[in-house]
Every structure is written in structure tokens, then in C-alpha cells.
């Protein structure tokens, strides 16, 4: 028998219980189950637009499945994890949790929903169909061995970079990021508060947050950046290009490749032996650029998307 509960705010005990479940899932799948945005919301105990839905084993009271929703700037993020020992119940548990999650979203005005799944199966497709979601974007995780081959580095135009200065560069970075990702559902529309939440993360290191300023004009202008990440608690040998972008007004100058190589060189110097990044499957230009640097596809992540109608519109 299973009991279900919904929390709009998580106590330290709730967070500890769910963290143990997430750790078990991560160990089984060798994959972090929640993205940074969802994880920060959980760790902070919830904020406006947060809900944590838990399925507990009646006999022991232990969480065996967890679903979380978090409101973003223009959409809702949703995720579902099931204890590896109870995955024979994925359809039953997932259907119950996801239906309650979408009910909450509907009651809070509805909107666009994104559910990201690593290695989507027929069960995920069935669960998505039950809550009227359909396949959307597909992300490729690509990896490359570090350090890069010398011929790759030699064939890349070197550009001057400097490390992000906390308390100084936030506004310039937000301007370029939001221009570059103006239509992106997750990376667009960042605020200083959201940036500061990432800066408070244990893995944040400004020395690996590389900025390229143009200095041959009257005022130094941020033209591109490469934000790298090494989560030493997860795997100190994998270095991620967390976010990379070129201001749209400076496209076509090869800055994307130059900043990618600069970021990978930094990660190698910090001890990473594998470089990793995510890219949309339909971004063929970026994929071609990364392939020339030696990247290959490691796995795919599928988004299930849909529009949840506000309950107010249904009455």
C-alpha cells in the first residue's frame, strides 16, 4: 500500500528524506536526477510555484517516488524519480504523482510544462500521454576527452578571456545571456536573483566563468562567455561547459569555437579528463562545431511538453 502527500514547503527532514532517495537514483543511473533549477528549489525548501509530491511506502513511511514542480520565468518544470527497487511500479506511481502535479499547475493558472527525461522509455511516453504531454525538444549530451588534441587547439583562434568578477560583471553578463537566449525556455530571462542562486552553489567557481570583452572600442563590451562547471561531489573528472553564448551582434566571428576551446582548456587545467556539454539536437551548426573539436554523443534527453489549461478557464 502506498500513501501520497503534497508539500508546498519542505522541512529539513523532508529535504533529507528526498535527498536520500535522489542519491539512490543517482547511484543506480549514474546520472543526477534533478537539474540545477529544481535542485535549488528543493534544497531551499520551496518558493512560490514549488510543490513536492511524495509516494511513501505505507509500512515503512519511506519515500519510494518523488515528483517536483517548479515555476520558471515563462513555463513550469516538472520531474519524476522512482526508487530503483520500485520501478516495477513506475506507471502506477508516476501516473498518480504526475496527475496531482498537473492539477496544481492548473489551479495556479496553468501554462507551458516541460518534463525532461534521460533515456526516455515506453513507460515515460505512456505517462506523458496520460497528462496530455507530447515529445518536444531533444538534447544531446556530448563529451570529449581532455586535454584537447594539439592540432585542435592550433586550429582555433585564441582570444583573451578574464574570469567573472562577482559584484562587478553581473549586469553585463545578464544582458548578453538574455539577448543570446531570448527565446530559450530555460536559459532566457535570467534575473540577478537567479544568477546569485547559482553563485551560492558549492560548485560555483568564478575562475572558470570566462568572459571575452572587446577592448578595441571606446567602452569594453562583453561579446561572449563560457561558464564552466565541475561538480566535485558528483564526478571531479567531468568538466561541463555549463552555458556558452555569443552576443548576437558579434555572431559570425568564430567566437563560439574560441570560447569553447578556452573553456575546455580551463577544465583540463582544473583536473577534468572529460569535457561535457548539452546541445539541442536540431542545432546542427553547433553540433558540427563541437564534432570538429572531437565531441561525440554520449546520450539523449527528451522533453515532454504541453499546455496545461487554467482551472479558472474550465469553469
Label each PLM-derived region with a short phrase.
Residues 71-75, 84-159, 304-306:
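Acyl-donor-binding surface of acyltransferase catalytic domains
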Residues 114-124, 248, 277-287, 304-309:
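Conserved beta-strand-loop-alpha-helix junction that forms the acyl-donor binding cleft
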Residues 83-86, 247-249, 253, 281-282:
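Active-site acidic-Proline motif in GNAT/NAT acetyltransferases
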Residues 181-228:
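Phosphate-binding active sites in nucleotide-utilizing proteins
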Residues 140-160, 273-284, 294, 299-315:
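C-terminal "cap" of GNAT-fold acetyltransferases
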Residues 8-10, 23-107, 223-238:
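Conserved donor-binding loop and adjoining core beta-sheet/short helix segment
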Residues 89-103, 243-246, 252-269, 287-292:
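Conserved acetyl-CoA-binding loop-helix of GNAT-fold acetyltransferases
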Residues 1-38, 154-188:
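Short amphipathic alpha-helix that is part of the acyltransferase structural core
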Amino acid at each position: 500500500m502506498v500513501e501520497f502527500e503534497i508539500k508546498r514547503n519542505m522541512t529539513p527532514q523532508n529535504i533529507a528524506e528526498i535527498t536520500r532517495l535522489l542519491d539512490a537514483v543517482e547511484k543506480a543511473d549514474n546520472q543526477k536526477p534533478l537539474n540545477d533549477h529544481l535542485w535549488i528549489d528543493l534544497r531551499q525548501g520551496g518558493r512560490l510555484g514549488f510543490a513536492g509530491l511524495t509516494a511513501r511506502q505505507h509500512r515503512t513511511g519511506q519515500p519510494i517516488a518523488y515528483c517536483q514542480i517548479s515555476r520558471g520565468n515563462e513555463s513550469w518544470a516538472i520531474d519524476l524519480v522512482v526508487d530503483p527497487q520500485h520501478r516495477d511500479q513506475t506507471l502506477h506511481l508516476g501516473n498518480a504523482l504526475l496527475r496531482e502535479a498537473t492539477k496544481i499547475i492548473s489551479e495556479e493558472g496553468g501554462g507551458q510544462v516541460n518534463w525532461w527525461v534521460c533515456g526516455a522509455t515506453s513507460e515515460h511516453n505512456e505517462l506523458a500521454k496520460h497528462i496530455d504531454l507530447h515529445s518536444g525538444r531533444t538534447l544531446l549530451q556530448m563529451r570529449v576527452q581532455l586535454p584537447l588534441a594539439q592540432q585542435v587547439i592550433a586550429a582555433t583562434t585564441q582570444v583573451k578571456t578574464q574570469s567573472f568578477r562577482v559584484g562587478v560583471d553581473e549586469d553585463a553578463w545578464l544582458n548578453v545571456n538574455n539577448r543570446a537566449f531570448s527565446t530559450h525556455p530555460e536559459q532566457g530571462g535570467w534575473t540577478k536573483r537567479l544568477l546569485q542562486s547559482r553563485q551560492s552553489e558549492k560548485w560555483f567557481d568564478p575562475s572558470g566563468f570566462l568572459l571575452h570583452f572587446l577592448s578595441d572600442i571606446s567602452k569594453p563590451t562583453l561579446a561572449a562567455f563560457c561558464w564552466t562547471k565541475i561538480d566535485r561531489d558528483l564526478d571531479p573528472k567531468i568538466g561541463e561547459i555549463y552555458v556558452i553564448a555569443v552576443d548576437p551582434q558579434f555572431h559570425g566571428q568564430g567566437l563560439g569555437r574560441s570560447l569553447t576551446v578556452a573553456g575546455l582548456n580551463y577544465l583540463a587545467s582544473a583536473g577534468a579528463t572529460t569535457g561535457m556539454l548539452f546541445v539541442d539536437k536540431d542545432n546542427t551548426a553547433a553540433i558540427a562545431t563541437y564534432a570538429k573539436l572531437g565531441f561525440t554523443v554520449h546520450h539523449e534527453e527528451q522533453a515532454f511538453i504541453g499546455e496545461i489549461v487554467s482551472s479558472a478557464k474550465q469553469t
